[in-house]
Every structure is written in C-alpha cells, then in structure tokens.
C-alpha cells in the first residue's frame, strides 16, 4: 500500500470512529427523531435463530435502537426474511451478509445481546468496512482522474469528513 493510500485508510477509520462516538453521544443527549427502531413486531414465521435473550438488557435495546430508517427494514429482512411486498425494495446482499456475519463471527454475542442487536452490530461493521474500502478506491480513482495526488488526498479527506458521512456508516 502506498503511503498516501495507507494514510487515507487510517483517516477513514478514524472518521468512522469519530462518527460512531458522535452518534452515541447524540443518542445519550437527545431523544431520537426517528422512532421506527422501537417498532419490533414478531416475525410472521418463526425465526430460525433466537431473537432475544431471556434477560433483554438496556445495552441490547440501545444497540437495536441504532437501526433507523431503512436499517429497520434491512435488519428485519435479515431476521425474518422477506415477509411483506414493500420489503422487496431492500435487496438481499446486505441482509444476507448481516445474517451470515451474525450467525458465524458474532454468534457468541447472541445469547448476551439477542439476535436483533447482533444483526445491527453486523450491519454497522459491514457498512463501516465498506466505507473504508470506498475511501481507498475513491483516492485511487481521484489520482487517476486528477493526475494530482495532493488534490486526490484533499478530496478523500472531504469524502471522509463531509456532513452526510453519518449515512455512510449507519445501518
């Protein structure tokens, strides 16, 4: 990895940690605008994985509440499958990847946090890894197009720290 590319990967990783910290701080200080995370009806068919531990703790509830807007639909599709017609708008790669990650690598967390919270963690990790990869490829593409590594670096920094980048990391 070339030194500027390694710097972009580090910068993108730091920006995701900063966004996560700011998101959690905002969750603690303010009431959420979108309350769709609290809507959690049971699956129409019985899920193949346990949905919640017997003692559902506040940590699991806080993690599950991080799935808002479209994240609610992605996590529901990962947990229950495609139950309703409107859920077909959310293509299966992300829900399938979330389910695979939560059933393999993060399976030991399911008895502690519950399946839904582990799905949300899996989705956040997948999206943040994809963001770091996108920042690296954005830098490489910018170098090819702009023919100036300094301008490509500045463009990548702006990509990592733009105000809308919170959406790149959320489920």
Residue spans of the language-model regions?
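A structural signal for well-ordered alpha-helical segments within the folded catalytic domains
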Residues: 15, 72, 91-95, 99, ...
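Residue-level signature of the transmembrane alpha-helical core
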Residues: 9-13, 17, 96, 124-129, ...
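Short acidic/glycine- and proline-prone juxtamembrane loop motifs at membrane-interface regions
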Residues: 25, 164, 169-171
């Amino acid at each position: 990895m070339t030194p500027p590319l390694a710097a972009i990967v580090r910068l993108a990783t730091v920006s995701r940690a900063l966004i996560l910290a700011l998101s959690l701080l905002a969750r603690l200080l303010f009431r959420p605008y979108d309350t769709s995370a609290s809507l959690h009806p049971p699956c129409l068919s019985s899920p193949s994985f346990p949905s919640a531990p017997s003692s559902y703790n506040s940590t699991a509830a806080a993690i599950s509440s991080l799935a808002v807007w479209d994240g609610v639909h992605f996590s529901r599709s990962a947990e229950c499958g495609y139950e309703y017609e409107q859920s077909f708008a959310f293509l299966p790669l992300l829900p399938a990847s979330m389910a695979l990650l939560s059933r393999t690598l993060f399976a030991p967390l399911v008895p502690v946090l519950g399946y839904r919270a582990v799905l949300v963690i899996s989705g956040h990790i997948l999206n943040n890894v994809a963001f770091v990869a996108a920042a690296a490829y954005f830098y490489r593409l910018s170098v090819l197009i702009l023919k100036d590594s300094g301008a490509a670096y500045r463009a990548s920094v702006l990509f990592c720290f733009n105000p809308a980048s919170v959406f790149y990391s959320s489920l």
